[in-house]
Amino acid sequence: GPSSGFFGMR
């Protein structure tokens, strides 16, 4: 998701 920690850019 947009705020998924390190993967926030997904």
Swiss-Prot record:
GO biological process, one term: neuropeptide signaling pathway
Compartment(s) where it occurs, according to its Swiss-Prot or TrEMBL record: Secreted
UniProt KW keywords: Amidation, Neuropeptide, Secreted
Organism: Acrosternum hilare (Green stink bug)
Any GO CC annotation of this UniProt entry: extracellular region
UniProt name for this protein: Tachykinin-related peptide 3
Origin superkingdom: Eukaryota
Tagged with keyword Transmembrane: no
Tissue specificity statement from the Swiss-Prot or TrEMBL entry: Expressed in the antennal lobe (at protein level).
Modification Arginine amide, positions: R10
Transmembrane segments: none
